[in-house]
Amino acid sequence: MSLFDLTALELGAKIQAGEVGAVEATRACLARIEAKEPTVHAFVTVTPEAAVARAEDVQKRIQSGELTHPLAGVPMAIKDLISTKGVRTTCSSKMLENYVPVFDATVVQKLDAIGAVCLGKTNMDEFAMGSSTESSYFGVTRNPWDLMRVPGGSSGGSAAAVAAREVFYALGSDTGGSIRQPASFCGVTGIKPTYGAVSRYGLLAYASSLDQIGPLTIDARDAAAVTAALMGKDEMDATSVAAPVPVLPEKARLDGLRVGIPQAYFGEGLDADVRERVMDAAHELERLGATLVEVDMPILKYSIPAYYILACA
């Protein structure tokens, strides 16, 4: 099995067991980035020297028993609107091309504490105002599955980096779909956490009452693990709360859960293959005990105008 067939948690387990080194995993990802970036262009900034130095330190701390988190030593990346001390944070804009923060965002501090190894900053729509990752000053990001297609946005670089297995997970931000939509375009898992569950301190804001930082990962278990690592009340963000940390059971059952199927989303123009895949997922939820319910949501026609008004207010 290739290193890149593993999920983040599977790699983390091998690192803890000494079967794979954090430095080995980091160097493998850096080599993959070098190979993939000419066509995918998921990154604005790659920090190979800092990443290897970080991996060496983390590996020593794992071997000494100091770092035991299941994601310790796992290579990852950060969307380029989250502050990283000493590493430029551009929002994919010419205006911030040379902006280097003097502090880490709270989420970066949390990942540092568990032993994450950051390889760089990922591309995005400029100032997160887009849904295709085509408006970046630093160039267009391509969908790794089909280079003629977009990866979605605005966290398209993070989604593409995970889909291309350049990293094992990445941070994105979501205001009106900027994690969830590129996750769907790139075939990875993305979560917009409940508002307030993850600190926004150090996130360059688009719409402060809507923004949330969240993960893009290979699967749901990775997403739960990364989300849990990010969560927690933060004195630097007055809107943050001590929300319950997600725990995935070994055997999922969804008895009693009602899942709405909005008919407005299944109208004319929807690709038949997309419809089939969505319903496959719905029927899998049904198999696990959920009840599928067709729902009418006429209010949906107001969602985009309302979003534009609120986001730009």
Predicted regions and their residues:
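Long amphipathic alpha-helix in the N-terminal Rossmann-like dinucleotide-binding domain
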Residues: E49-E56, G115-A116, D125
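Conserved hydrophobic/aromatic pocket- or pore-lining residues that grip, position, or stack substrates
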Residues: C29, A51, G73, K79, ...
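Immediate post-signal peptide segment of exported/extracytoplasmic ligand-binding proteins
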Residues: V58-V74, D222, K251-G260
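An N-terminal boundary/leader segment
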Residues: M1-V52, Q63, R287-L288
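Short glycine/serine-rich loop segments
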Residues: P101-L230
